[in-house]
């Protein structure tokens, strides 16, 4: 089971730390040599976290600037025209995660067709050496870079010798002998396998957005819900169903149950996200909210009446509350 207390303690270390975010590498002007890692870091999963921890630790011990170079949009959206690709984290969620891990500078490089045509040697010389004043590069075991992903880790190590920087290669991080990747994380979310998702992420998968007014059907059944609206269209959503969730409300953790789906019992037409908190009273309309998913309870179903649906919600609440002690 995911140890949430350990996760909170680990990330609270940099709770008041402020990371600088720079859009486009041309806007960065090095003040001292840097230690850099490169990637999309979608999900910032446990493999990414190993790289980031090494980056921050070595930056401190070697007096280097800790830089994460990432790309937006995701290269697949540009190179493969993959308009269906959904992101595990929004750019802002990624920013928050990297900041809590102690990264000094996040450079968000616009990924364009022109940028993708840089050869490996051009990327090394123009971006890493001249642009970032690199002293050390930390990368994952499967990293490839340059036009058409032409260069490997071994190529990078040779470039390091040529341009006088070190290259540290980080091995795969496993969960139950399975190498973790963003694709594996994405697949578990889509399958509703949230417990496995959270193992891969080392933290709860989350959804963030604004609370908007709904049609108050839940309130009529005794289950007033907060309706979450996510503005980012490419944000990954889990498959339809009921989930045990938690959120930080009024400086404390509140548990609840979330339904994501079209609400077939009331002939809903579009996907909606509704959360009922067990021990919270108050008006959340207009607030920004981050919902952390802990476990899936069941798939979405259609019921003959609102009364039948209400009975099922009571069962769902009891199922959720039995699970809560595991997360305290």
Where in the sequence are the language-model features?
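Residue-level signal for inorganic ion chemistry
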Residues: 45, 98, 137, 197, ...
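N-terminal Rossmann-like or analogous alpha/beta NTP/dinucleotide-binding catalytic cores
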Residues: 77-141, 145-163
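Phosphate/ribose-recognition catalytic cores of enzymes acting on nucleotide-derived substrates
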Residues: 214-328
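Glycine-rich, Lys/Arg-enriched anion-binding loops that position phosphate/diphosphate groups
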Residues: 160-257
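N-terminal catalytic cores of NTP/NDP-binding nucleotidyl/phosphoryl-transfer enzymes
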Residues: 25-90
